[in-house]
């Protein structure tokens, strides 16, 4: 079952259907706050 990630009202379900970690990484790289996912962007840098 695909996990729908909604950020700022945008559905990212079909953009990156791989892993949550990858979604968080991509989200941080474009400046999206991923604090709601339980991950922190600072851990990637």
Swiss-Prot record:
InterPro entries: Corona_NS4 (IPR005603). Changing residue 29 to F: In strain: Isolate BCQ.1523. It comes from the Viruses. Pfam families: Corona_NS4 (PF03905). Belongs to the coronaviruses ns4/ns4.8 protein family. This is Non-structural protein of 4.8 kDa. It comes from Bovine coronavirus (strain Quebec).
């Amino acid at each position: 079952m695909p996990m729908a990630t909604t950020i700022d009202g945008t559905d990212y379900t079909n953009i990156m259907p791989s892993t949550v970690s990858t979604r968080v990484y991509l989200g941080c790289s474009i400046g999206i706050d991923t604090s709601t996912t339980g991950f922190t962007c600072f851990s990637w840098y």
